[in-house]
């Protein structure tokens, strides 16, 4: 098993290319199940979760061909073809590796008339039920069964039917599953209180490129006119706003200057505003965003919430950054109930953090010290890397397979902007 070793204290400076978005890619990949024609995705990141999803698609009968990307951006190109659906069963041994596997449920039941999917795995950051996914499919006429750790969805005779879906709470995954099912349902589907994340906008635009008819893209009300079939397309995966935000925090915590090549301000307003409030310079340029930090960081009060508010996927990284701020910050996690597992590891390095329910009180300190720390989930892992970049001495982050699920070539990218970081084997 690998570990990341960091010798802290270097000011980061240079150009850092932003990869295609993990969360968008995992939503776009199952679109291949919606058409018998070829779907090609470009700017696809090289990540463990993306590879696992590709194996799942192969299991379902999708043929895949990968080629390498060119230029400063590092995305790959994947061509997928699902002329026929060979299987409608997504087995446990693949699905257990990542929660996003549940996103084959909607496309399979929409095109093949049925789907059997193992209940998903992924990061252990709290109770993330799929009941909203299932209720959305039921609103389109699907019959749902739960047994032996699997969920089975069966379309009525003649296929799914358009309907009205009103989400009681905002759910990104349920919105994605419902949207992919609705594009092949008969008639009109209206989705109220739909999630508005940029990754959902990316999904909707890909579906439109495949022939879907969707109104209200980017709003919380989506209206879909179902089609009997979709055609193939080529679509570019959006840049990863969470990766960009994470490396912006790396510039901030080290007092550095990094050009985030490919990052888009429209996708990151809440993140960028948080950085500005903390005293970090943000300067958009043609093709990216420059992040500059000089002097002590200022404390913040932040709450996570669905887009366009501050994203839960940036909470851990901001916590690491604010551990070095001049004053006391207050972070409140409203999305997941168990997303402070990085706190004990940060405190072992000298951070002063107290958790009270969903709220964390972060008192800035002048120095933290390198240590052996254990990654617990994807974003928590990145917070430990950020702390290691500024810590005195050597930090070793163990169980970095979590990082490999969401950050492409992390140690290479950080090394290129001046970090003393390397991947080693735990032996």
UniProtKB/Swiss-Prot annotation:
Signal peptide (UniProt feature, chain positions): none
Binding-site positions, phosphoenolpyruvate: 22-23
GO BP terms, alphabetized: cell division; cell wall organization; peptidoglycan biosynthetic process; regulation of cell shape; UDP-N-acetylgalactosamine biosynthetic process
Enzyme class: transferase
Regions crossing the membrane: none
Record's GO cellular component terms: cytoplasm
Catalytic activity: phosphoenolpyruvate + UDP-N-acetyl-alpha-D-glucosamine = UDP-N-acetyl-3-O-(1-carboxyvinyl)-alpha-D-glucosamine + phosphate
Main location: cytoplasm
Catalytic residues as annotated in Swiss-Prot or TrEMBL: 123 (proton donor)
Residues that, per the record, bind UDP-N-acetyl-alpha-D-glucosamine: 99, 128-132, 313, 335
PANTHER family, per the entry: UDP-N-ACETYLGLUCOSAMINE 1-CARBOXYVINYLTRANSFERASE
HAMAP family: MurA (MF_00111)
Protein name, entry field: UDP-N-acetylglucosamine 1-carboxyvinyltransferase
Native source species: Rhizorhabdus wittichii (strain DSM 6014 / CCUG 31198 / JCM 15750 / NBRC 105917 / EY 4224 / RW1)
